[in-house]
């Protein structure tokens, strides 16, 4: 049984998340979303997605892919810093109070736990290991940058 069951987005708290901080996809979800939208993964990434970053308990900053946040004129297909992610921004797929990709929404969004903050952190930590070097490779090439994966037992740099 999945420790993080799929939930409905039919409450104000879930919709508030769509206006602040979009959830992360699992790597295998992105090709399925691209196919559903009839575009290549590259076109989807450059037009609707972004690389997000999260900070692990050991201090490592690691990357994963999320919907682009509409804010400050920042372009899709780029990397968001922790500071940028701290400011609210509407998910590119949230329109007129609804998720336009509901059936294909990010893993994290489908399991939103706004009422259980500790579990929400555990949910993100479940997603992070799926963003391996291989899973991030294509997106790293598209943003022309080095993206970080979580490396347990790696010592934090001072």
Q: Where do the language-model regions lie?
A:
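Short loop/turn segments that flank or connect secondary-structure elements
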Residues: 1-158
């Amino acid at each position: 049984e999945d420790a993080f069951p799929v939930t409905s987005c039919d409450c104000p708290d879930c919709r508030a998340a769509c206006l602040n901080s979009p959830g992360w996809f699992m790597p295998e979800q992105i090709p399925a979303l691209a196919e559903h939208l009839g575009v290549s993964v590259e076109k989807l990434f450059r037009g609707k997605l972004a690389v997000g970053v999260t900070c692990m308990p050991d201090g490592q900053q690691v990357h994963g892919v999320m919907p682009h946040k509409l804010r400050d004129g920042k372009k899709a297909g780029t990397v968001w810093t922790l500071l940028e992610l701290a400011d609210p921004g509407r998910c590119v797929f949230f329109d007129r109070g609804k998720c336009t990709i509901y059936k294909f929404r990010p893993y994290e969004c489908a399991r939103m736990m706004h009422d259980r903050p500790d579990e929400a952190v555990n949910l993100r930590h479940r997603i992070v290991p799926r963003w391996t070097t291989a899973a991030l490779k294509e997106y790293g090439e598209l943003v022309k940058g080095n993206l970080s994966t979580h490396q347990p037992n790696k010592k934090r740099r001072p």
